[in-house]
Amino acid sequence: MNHLIFLQSIMNLRGVGRKKSYAIVNQLQLDKSVNVSENEFIEQFSSIKEFKLYKIEINELRQCIDAAKRIFDEHAKNNISSVAFFENDFPKKLLEIKDPPVLLFYKGNISKLNNANGIAVVGARKPSLNSYDVSNSYAQIIAENNLGIISGLAKGCDTAAHKGALEKKGFTVAVMPCSLDDESIYPKENIDLFHAILEEDN
């Protein structure tokens, strides 16, 4: 059981969110080198205060491990990669926010998030034609100045910004609130844009 399954198992536990996950990771001194059996994981987790505090049963812990394995099995089928907050590839700026994620799931070249500067674009999902054109034009200018465009692949201004960056062969990042398999991508009308971003090795 590697560090990613270990972390996801913790995140699956009842009453354990991101902040508690960070505390548990620190207590267990978890890092990328961890490779333990299910029984070793249960033994380690049983030794910390959260286990007693939330009155978590052993069978519940096993269910969380099984659920984590299913997640990563599905990710493997869909070429979805993962990175933990303590790994070098994890976006450093993301660690500066108040409540950073413990795990990040991604497709494409995540190293660009650490090696290049970017500008976030947020706008209306139903913009006027002028607003759409402005978002697209600004994104092109930003891309021409070697800055990335970070947006959410939503309809409207997000779409315009991603397309503007791609038109100038710039890099763009789509931050998604859903899984990254084709069936889950939303909105469906942006599935081609999603793949265009990946094809540019972004």
Short names for language-model regions:
Residues 1-136, 140:
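Short, positively charged patches
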Residues 85-202:
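Glycine-biased, small-residue-rich flexible motifs in mid-sequence functional cores and linkers
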